[in-house]
Curated annotation (Swiss-Prot):
Single Gene Ontology BP annotation: tetrahydrofolate interconversion
GO cellular component, one term: cytosol
Source organism superkingdom: Bacteria
Annotated Pfam families: SHMT
Keyword Amino-acid biosynthesis on entry: yes
Name of the molecule in the record: Serine hydroxymethyltransferase
Record keywords: Amino-acid biosynthesis, Cytoplasm, One-carbon metabolism, Pyridoxal phosphate, Transferase
Function per UniProt: Catalyzes the reversible interconversion of serine and glycine with tetrahydrofolate (THF) serving as the one-carbon carrier. This reaction serves as the major source of one-carbon groups required for the biosynthesis of purines, thymidylate, methionine, and other important biomolecules. Also exhibits THF-independent aldolase activity toward beta-hydroxyamino acids, producing glycine and aldehydes, via a retro-aldol mechanism.
Oligomeric form and interacting partners: Homodimer.
C-alpha cells in the first residue's frame, strides 16, 4: 500500500479501514464472501489494461492472444465445474447475466413467472422497480403461508392460467432446497422455457450439496462471488443450441469490452472450486448454517420456514416491535454485519422490514466452525435484546473482535 498511501492517502485509508473491518468484524451477509489471495492477485493484475471486445479468437482488437488464454481457461473450467454445454464468463454482474438471457429468449411484453421479491426472490426476477418488471408482463409466485416454502401447486396453477414464455427460478433469501425438476415439469405443461438464477447456491451446487439446475433448465445464471467465492461478477451457462444468441446478447447486445482482470480472477476461482478442499468448505458452510439456525431457535428466534437447508436463514420479527432496520443497526454496533430483509407476507416498508438475512459463507472462509456458531448465536441474541444500549453493544463488539482475531483472514505482510 506504500505507493497508494503516498499518492492518495484518502483512498488508502479507506481501504485499510475496510481491510480491518473484514478481519475483525463478523461478516454474516449471505451474499458476501472473501476471495483468496490468488484471486486478489489475478484481479489486481495488468489484465485490467487490456480491451478485448468479442470472444477468444474473434476479437475486435489486436494483442489479445494472452487474454484469450485466460478467458478460454475460465470457460472450460466453468463448464467442467457445472457439467454445462456452454459458458459465457463475460457478464459484469448477475443482473446483466439475467438481462442477456431475457433479451435472447423473450420479446418485450412476454409473460414470465418469477418469485415474489418479498417472498425471497430477486429484483431481476420481475420486480416493478427493475428493468425485468418494466419490459415484461410479470406474474409473481411465492411461498405457502403455512410452510413458508415454495408453493409448487400455486406455481403450476399460475403457469396453466397465464401460459408464461419463461419461468424464472431462484432466490436471494430462500433458505430451503429448490426442486428444479418440479419447475421443469410445470414448464413442460405450458411449453415454457426455464431460467434458473443460482447466484446464491452456486458453490453448493458445484460441491454437490444442492441439486444441480443444469439438467432441468435451458439457461442457468449465477454470480461468481457469494458461495462460489470468486470475484464479483456474473456468468451464464446454457445448452449449446442457445450459445450463439447468448453470446451476441452479452456482446454487442448489452456490454462492450469484457473486464479481463475479473475474468482472470473468475478462472482462478473456478480452479479453486474444482479442488477437493472446496467441497469440504461448502459442507462446513452448510453445517455452520444448520448449527446457527438451531441455536437461534433455541434462543427464541423465529426463522422463516423454521430453519435452513443451505447457507442462509431469515430471522422473522413480524408480530414484534423489533424491525429489521433496528436489528441491523444494533448488530452493526456489535461488530456483526448482516442486512435487513423483507419476510414473506411482509407488512413493513422495504426500508424498514421485519427480517434479518444471515449467511455463513464468509464466516466459514474465516475458519469458524460449529462451536463458534454457538457463540455467534449468543452474540446475535444479546445484540437484538439490547437494541438502543450502545454500551452493551460495544461490549459485545469487543467479544466479537476477540473471537475474530483467532481466525485471521489474510496474512499480514
Amino acid at each position: 500500500m506504500s505507493i497508494l498511501s503516498t499518492l492518495d492517502p484518502e483512498v488508502a485509508d479507506a481501504i485499510r479501514l475496510e481491510a480491518d473491518r473484514q478481519e475483525y468484524n463478523l461478516e454474516l451477509i449471505a451474499s458476501e464472501n472473501f476471495v483468496s489471495t490468488a484471486v486478489l492477485e489475478a484481479q489486481g493484475s495488468v489484465l485490467t489494461n487490456k480491451y478485448a471486445e468479442g470472444y477468444p479468437g474473434k476479437r475486435y482488437y489486436g494483442g489479445c492472444h494472452n487474454v484469450d488464454i485466460v478467458e478460454a481457461l475460465a470457460i472450460e473450467r466453468a463448464k467442467q465445474l457445472f457439467d454445462a454445454e456452454h459458458a459465457n464468463v463475460q457478464p459484469h454482474s448477475g443482473s446483466q447475466a439475467n438481462m442477456a438471457v431475457y433479451f435472447s429468449a423473450l420479446k418485450p411484453g412476454d409473460t414470465i413467472l418469477g418469485m415474489n421479491l418479498s417472498h425471497g426472490g430477486h429484483l431481476t426476477h420481475g420486480s416493478p422497480v427493475n428493468f425485468s418488471g418494466r419490459f415484461f408482463n410479470v406474474v409473481p409466485y411465492g411461498v405457502s403461508p403455512e410452510t413458508q416454502t415454495i408453493d409448487y401447486a400455486e406455481v403450476e396453477r399460475l403457469a396453466l392460467e397465464h401460459k408464461p414464455k419463461m419461468i424464472v427460478v431462484g432466490a436471494s433469501a430462500y433458505p430451503r432446497t429448490i426442486d428444479f425438476a418440479a419447475f421443469r415439469a410445470i414448464a413442460d405443461k405450458v411449453g415454457a422455457l426455464v431460467m434458473v438464477d443460482m447466484a446464491h447456491i452456486a458453490g453448493l451446487v458445484a460441491a454437490g450439496l444442492h441439486p444441480s439446475p443444469i439438467p432441468h433448465a435451458e439457461f442457468v445464471t449465477t454470480t461468481t462471488h457469494k458461495t462460489l467465492r470468486g470475484p464479483r461478477g456474473g456468468m451464464i451457462l446454457c445448452q449449446e443450441r442457445f450459445a450463439k444468441s447468448i453470446n451476441s446478447q452479452i456482446f454487442p447486445g448489452i456490454q462492450g469490452g469484457p473486464l479481463m482482470h475479473v475474468i482472470a480472477a473468475k478462472a482462478v476461482a473456478f480452479k479453486e472450486a474444482l479442488q477437493p478442499e472446496f467441497k469440504q468448505y461448502q459442507q462446513q458452510v452448510v453445517n455452520n448454517a444448520r448449527t446457527l439456525a438451531e441455536e437461534l431457535v433455541k434462543r427464541g428466534f423465529k426463522l422463516t420456514s423454521g430453519g435452513t437447508d443451505n447457507h442462509l436463514m431469515l430471522l422473522d420479527f413480524s408480530g414484534t416491535e423489533i424491525t429489521g432496520k433496528a436489528a441491523e443497526e444494533a448488530l452493526d454496533k456489535a461488530g456483526i454485519t448482516a442486512n435487513k430483509n423483507t419476510v414473506p407476507f411482509e407488512t413493513r416498508s422495504p426500508f424498514v422490514t421485519s427480517g434479518i438475512r444471515i449467511g455463513t459463507p464468509a464466516a466459514t472462509t474465516h475458519g469458524l466452525k460449529e462451536a463458534e456458531m454457538v457463540l455467534v448465536a449468543g452474540f446475535i441474541a444479546d445484540a437484538v435484546a439490547n437494541i438502543g444500549s450502545d454500551e452493551t453493544l460495544a461490549a459485545i463488539k469487543l467479544q466479537v473482535n476477540q473471537l475474530m482475531k483467532k481466525f485471521p483472514l489474510y496474512a499480514k505482510g
